[in-house]
């Protein structure tokens, strides 16, 4: 039975996940733009968030591997959280002394390592959340988690840009390190007080390794579990709802073709947003908006708009099926990108910025809601968690790899053509969606 203390822990999970993502994501992007780093370089550095795209590969390790000393004190899950949080505290503090203008290579490498530990912790927290929460309460607690996630994004995103009016980003990242430390203490205290982590310890497997030890003679099945997870990963994915009557032609070639279509769609559908997200900070600074305006409208209002869009999208999807919704939302959202062209033509205009960010964020929240619902609808059977992790990683690939060309596009073709491209590139994904729809009907 869940109580308020358990809900607080779920909220803390979301808070730190959203907070950590922004540290190496949009906030870092703003820092680089503020330091007048070349647009091409800013685009390339979008790959820093790549660990979030492959974190599903780490999941079996965190399930099976037991940390030698920390496990005796904190237990299995909490010991991993302590390890990753401690690493993040030290790495973020070290990062706060680096300057992207004088040593960009070391700056980038450190940010990538921070991103790795952030993604690792995100994986652990996601697994723990599903273990603490009863199945019938997952929907409600997901809302608590997402609320915490958005608050974390606001703190490390809009909050950091507000602080940049008074502090340097080196000082701000020192504050970040302190906040991660405070979070760790709060989580340890809350976990000990509620014994939430103890509820799932007996369900966790352990395995000996050079980083860990086993209780007694250990469990030799854990090494087999990890090897089996990786060797059969594609089989796990293929043995889903895609077999059988869900595809008109049930042969393997048709199955492979259908899966490829889905993967391409998942990458392309999110690509326009991901291109814009990498360049939005340089764009707003190019239009000479100050830190207060960017934090208030570009970030805070953007998050509020995304929340509103998620609610609107969820309401509409009660009356329309997922495929029709994701198609409709995609068209509306693509048209919203055109407003950035008007913003570039008109120059600095606070009202137009408010309207542009509002429409972009609300329609973006709608598409994201439908996108997640679509991924969830594809996952069935006993391996649905693995399927979901794999499919959602396509969103991460779209966010981390393809936007590396965004800076080159702006430099060579200009802002207006860049935003026009983000509108047009939606068309291929919608055509693929129509093809997927015919396959499923």
From Swiss-Prot:
**What keywords were assigned to this record?**
Cell inner membrane, Cell membrane, Membrane, Transmembrane, Transmembrane helix, Transport
Major localization class: membrane
Q: Which domain of life is it from?
A: Bacteria
List where the protein spans the membrane: 5-25, 42-62, 78-98, 104-124, 143-163, 171-191, 249-269, 297-317, 325-345, 352-372, 390-410, 413-433
Residues annotated as coiled-coil are none
Q: List the InterPro entries.
A: AmpG_permease/AT-1, MFS, MFS_dom, MFS_trans_sf
Q: What GO CC annotations are associated with the protein?
A: plasma membrane
Q: How does it sit in the membrane?
A: Multi-pass membrane protein
- Extract the PROSITE patterns matched here: MFS
Where would you find this protein in the cell?
A: Cell inner membrane
GO MF entry, a single one: transmembrane transporter activity
- Could you tell me which PANTHER family the record lists for this protein? MAJOR FACILITATOR SUPERFAMILY DOMAIN-CONTAINING PROTEIN 3, SOLUTE CARRIER FAMILY 33 ACETYL-COA TRANSPORTER -RELATED
- Return the similarity comment: Belongs to the major facilitator superfamily.
Protein name, entry field? Putative transporter AmpG 1
Q: Which organism is it from?
A: Rickettsia felis (strain ATCC VR-1525 / URRWXCal2)
Q: Which gene encodes it?
A: ampG1
């Amino acid at each position: 039975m869940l109580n308020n203390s358990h809900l607080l822990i779920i909220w803390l999970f979301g808070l730190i996940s959203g907070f950590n993502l922004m540290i190496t994501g949009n906030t870092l992007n703003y820092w680089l733009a503020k330091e007048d780093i070349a647009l091409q370089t800013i685009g390339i550095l979008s790959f820093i968030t790549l660990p979030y795209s492959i974190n599903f590969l780490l999941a079996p390790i965190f399930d099976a591997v037991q940390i030698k000393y920390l496990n005796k004190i904190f237990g299995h899950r909490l010991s991993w959280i302590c390890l990753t949080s401690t690493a993040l505290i030290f790495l973020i503090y070290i990062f706060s002394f680096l300057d992207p203008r004088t040593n960009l290579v070391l700056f980038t490498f450190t940010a990538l390592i921070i991103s790795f530990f952030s993604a690792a912790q995100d994986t652990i927290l996601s697994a723990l959340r599903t273990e603490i929460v009863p199945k019938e309460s997952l929907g409600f607690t997901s809302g608590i988690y997402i609320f915490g996630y958005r608050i974390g994004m606001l703190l490390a995103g809009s909050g950091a840009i507000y602080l940049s009016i008074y502090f340097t980003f080196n000082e701000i990242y020192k504050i970040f390190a302190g906040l991660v430390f405070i979070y760790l203490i709060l989580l340890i205290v809350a976990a000990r007080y509620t014994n939430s982590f103890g509820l799932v310890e007996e369900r966790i497997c352990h395995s000996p390794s050079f980083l860990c030890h086993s209780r007694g003679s250990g469990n030799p099945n854990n090494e087999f579990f990890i090897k089996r997870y990786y060797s059969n990963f594609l089989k796990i994915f293929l043995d889903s709802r895609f077999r059988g009557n869900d595809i008109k032609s049930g042969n393997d070639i048709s199955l492979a073709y259908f899966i490829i279509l889905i993967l391409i769609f998942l990458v392309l559908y999110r690509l326009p947003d991901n291109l814009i997200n990498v360049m939005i900070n340089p764009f707003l600074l190019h239009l000479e908006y100050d830190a207060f305006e960017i934090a208030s409208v570009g970030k805070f209002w953007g998050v509020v708009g995304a929340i509103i869009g998620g609610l609107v999208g969820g309401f509409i999807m009660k009356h329309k099926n997922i495929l029709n919704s994701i198609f409709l939302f995609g068209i509306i959202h693509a048209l919203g990108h055109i407003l950035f062209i008007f913003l570039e033509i008109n120059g600095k205009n606070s009202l137009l910025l408010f309207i542009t960010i509002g429409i972009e964020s609300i329609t973006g929240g709608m598409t994201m809601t439908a996108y997640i619902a679509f991924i969830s609808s594809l996952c069935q059977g006993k391996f649905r968690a693995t399927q979901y992790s794999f499919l959602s990683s396509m969103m991460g690939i779209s966010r981390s790899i393809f936007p590396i060309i965004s800076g080159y596009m702006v430099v060579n073709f200009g802002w207006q053509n860049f935003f026009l491209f983000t509108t047009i590139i939606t068309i291929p994904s919608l055509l693929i969606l129509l093809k997927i729809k015919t396959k499923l009907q």
